[in-house]
């Protein structure tokens, strides 16, 4: 901290050594160029030193805050490859890449519209039929569970014993449960050719 304060004091001493110190009002004015803070005498001294060395004057931009010898970089600007990948990805969605709408005659458009609507109607009927079958299966399982809950036995067991045993699922996922050959069978909408192999042994 002390070295920073010393360097600032030395800089202020060199700036205000050649002329009068600026007034506080001049320092508070907004949008003041950087050359206003330098005394005019320092600028004249630097210009005279360049003239004594055989030069016409200080380099351009010395008093305007521009770095001496700074040049604009030439050549193409380097672009981040990640930006290029993003632009290529979204270029497919550009309006220039979207194909124009189909232009049909009146009769051909009517045929196209009829086939399209018929296909949508067929898919909706299939979806509703599948949902109806699933709803019936769920209702059947619910009725079976309700029947087990109201059933007595076996033997002297109390009412609902079979329902509790069915909901506990003890031994279903063990070695003595359903054979893996049947448990891993792919679920299909139609029954298999052989529903159960009674002669199978582990």
Curated annotation (Swiss-Prot):
Residues 42-79 are annotated as: Disordered. Transmembrane segments: none annotated. Signal peptide: none annotated. GO terms for molecular function: structural constituent of ribosome. One of its GO terms (cellular component) is ribonucleoprotein complex. It is found in: Mitochondrion. Its main location: mitochondrion. InterPro entries: Ribosomal_mL40_fung. Disulfide bonds: none annotated. GO terms for biological process: mitochondrial translation. The keyword Mitochondrion applies. Keywords: Mitochondrion, Ribonucleoprotein, Ribosomal protein, Transit peptide. Belongs to the mitochondrion-specific ribosomal protein mL40 family. Component of the mitochondrial ribosome (mitoribosome), a dedicated translation machinery responsible for the synthesis of mitochondrial genome-encoded proteins, including at least some of the essential transmembrane subunits of the mitochondrial respiratory chain. The mitoribosomes are attached to the mitochondrial inner membrane and translation products are cotranslationally integrated into the membrane. This is Large ribosomal subunit protein mL40. The gene is mrpl28.
């Amino acid at each position: 901290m002390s070295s920073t304060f010393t360097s600032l004091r030395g800089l202020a001493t060199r700036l205000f050594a050649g002329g009068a110190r600026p007034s506080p009002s001049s320092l508070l004015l907004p949008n003041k160029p950087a050359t206003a803070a330098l005394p005019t005498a320092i600028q004249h001294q630097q210009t005279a030193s360049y003239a004594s060395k055989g030069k016409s004057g200080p380099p351009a931009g010395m008093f305007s805050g521009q770095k001496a010898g700074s040049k604009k970089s030439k050549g193409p600007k380097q672009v981040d490859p990640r930006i290029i990948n993003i632009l290529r990805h979204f270029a497919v969605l550009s309006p220039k890449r979207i194909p124009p709408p189909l232009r049909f005659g009146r009769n051909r458009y009517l045929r196209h519209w009829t086939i399209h609507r018929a296909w949508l109607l067929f898919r909706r009927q299939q979806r509703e039929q599948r949902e109806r079958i699933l709803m019936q299966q769920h209702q059947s399982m619910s009725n079976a569970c309700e029947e087990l809950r109201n059933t007595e036995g076996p033997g002297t067991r109390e009412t609902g014993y079979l329902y509790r045993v069915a909901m506990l699922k003890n031994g279903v996922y063990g070695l003595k449960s359903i054979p893996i050959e049947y448990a891993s069978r792919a679920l299909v909408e139609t029954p298999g050719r052989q529903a159960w192999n009674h002669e199978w042994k582990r």
